[in-house]
């Protein structure tokens, strides 16, 4: 279960609460999309499904083919899954524990669950996508929020200068 949760978090860049609120009805496997329209929170000891963090958090995300296949396989493993059942009936603490365990076993530094979202945005920046396109995908309210991730690529400035040198010599 945690494997699939972490796959969605990384490859779609969604928030932890958005992940924990997902139901089968949020997936369109023909179109390979994932609809984000709610969020999970624990308030006063009770599980609560709320509206997303911001207006732009309501969105449809295109999933990569391999992730779409993985999630279809995951659904086949879930017994008695209803269209409105949470597909990850976990707490945020359970995700955090799973991440800590996975990091320890693999010998890497422990990261926060939210760092998977940062990594997704960073990957898309590195792939050359615009801040606007990335912001729309991850539900950022403004492009300025997406620009906060620019510091994650310190070599970009050097690469730019190198490419400008090549351009000038042509």
Q: Where are the regions that the model predicts?
A:
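Basic, Lys/Arg- and aromatic-enriched nucleic-acid-binding interface segment
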Residues: 1-16, 20-22, 30, 66, ...
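Short alpha-helical segment immediately N-terminal to, or the first helix within
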Residues: 8-9, 123-124, 137
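Acidic donor-binding helix in nucleotide-sugar-dependent glycosyltransferases
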Residues: 18, 133-136
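C-terminal secondary-structure termini that scaffold catalytic or DNA-interacting sites
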Residues: 31, 44, 50-58, 62-67, ...
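Active-site/catalytic core of tyrosine-dependent DNA strand-transfer enzymes
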Residues: 31, 39-42, 64-109
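Catalytic-site neighborhood detector that most strongly recognizes the C-terminal catalytic loop/helix
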Residues: 40, 131, 138-163
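Short basic/aromatic active-site micro-motif
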Residues: 90-91, 109-128
